[in-house]
Structures are given as structure tokens and as C-alpha cells.
Amino acid sequence: MELQVVGANALTVSETTFGREFNEALIHQVVVAYAAGARQGSRAQKTRAEVSGSGKKPWRQKGTGRARSGDIKSPIWRSGGVTFAAKPQDHSQKVNKKMYRGAIKSILSELVRQDRLVVVEKFEIDVPKTKVLVQKLKDMALTDALIITASLDENLFLAARNLYKVDVRDVQAIDPVSLIAFDKVVVTVDAVKQIEEMFA
């Protein structure tokens, strides 16, 4: 199959990478797993056994008129332990390489079908200035875009840092969430070739 390159001849690409059927269930599973893996999972609370303090009974069981109490670390006391204390946990989900690659290829294929994948000969700016990048995107009628280059362009990266709806990645850093998060995905010809090699 062929991809139209802006201002240049069409680029012949692999049908297996850019012409796959849309597999919604697979993409959903991989995106959920990716998001779960990004969770910090480091929350930690103390049970009554872990709270620092004396284990002495505050007052005798009977005869004071007060409610019976055996421990100042009781969950119903101020500064006591937590009844069902949260503990650090790993939220990551296992995704096979074959599934991950399949999801990426399915997303790329769907981007092609929806005319959301824009292939350009090259995408670069001379200075790391946000206004220069904004003007370049404006010339291409783009406002919400992920820019993928073969290797990370420092000028592009610095210029895009202050733009909420623009992100710059190299091929090694693409992921399923970022591919579906933007209206358009701008890819250089060299990046397309790298993607084909990676996901062949």
C-alpha cells in the first residue's frame, strides 16, 4: 500500500503495519494495561499494629463510667491506626510483545483510514522557539498534533514543551496512549521506515 507524503511522491509501506484491521478489544486491553502501569501505587497507611505509641490500657475496664478502651491506637481514636490500611501495590498488567505490537499497528492503520496520519519528508525548525513551531503548524493547518521523528530533534522538543496540544517524540518513545490522544499524528518518512522495521 502507499501513503501520501505532503509535497512529495507517495511512499510504499507494508500492509501488515499500516493496513491491519481495527481490533478494538486488543487496543482497549493494551491501553488499559499501559495506563495501569503508569500508576504510582505507593500509598501507605498504618494499621493499629504499626502506629507508634504505648500498648498500655488507658484506664481500667470497669468502674470509671467511661467507655471501655484497651488501646490508644484504636481506629476509632484520634491519631489511631486505619482499619483497612492501604498498602503499596503493583498495578501493572502483563501484555505480551505480540499483543503490544499488534495494538500499535492496529492504531496506525486506523489513523491512516481516518486521514489522521500526516506523512512529511522532514519536520524541523532552525531555532527552539515556540512561536516558530506554532507558525509551522499553522501553515499545515494543525493545532492538535503528535510529531514523530526518527531521532529526537532538540529544537522541536524545546519548542513544543510549552504547547498543551502538541507533543514531540522519537520512534522509540511512541506508545498507544499518545497515538490516540491527538487529532493528527505527523510522521517523517524516516520515522515511517523505522516504525516498519520495529513492528515488522
Swiss-Prot record:
- In Gene Ontology terms, what is a biological process of this protein? translation
Q: Which UniProt keywords apply?
A: Ribonucleoprotein, Ribosomal protein, RNA-binding, rRNA-binding
Give yes or no: UniProt keyword Ion transport: no
Disordered: annotated segments? 43-71
List the record's Gene Ontology CC terms alphabetically.
ribonucleoprotein complex; ribosome
From the record, give the cysteines joined by S-S bonds.
Answer: none
Which family, according to the similarity comment? Belongs to the universal ribosomal protein uL4 family.
Q: Describe, as the record does, how this protein assembles with itself and its partners.
A: Part of the 50S ribosomal subunit.
Primary role: One of the primary rRNA binding proteins, this protein initially binds near the 5'-end of the 23S rRNA. It is important during the early stages of 50S assembly. It makes multiple contacts with different domains of the 23S rRNA in the assembled 50S subunit and ribosome.
Query: What is the protein name given in its UniProt record?
Result: Large ribosomal subunit protein uL4
Look up and give the organism this protein is from: Histophilus somni (strain 2336)
Source lineage: Bacteria, Pseudomonadati, Pseudomonadota, Gammaproteobacteria, Pasteurellales
What gene is it encoded by?
Answer: rplD
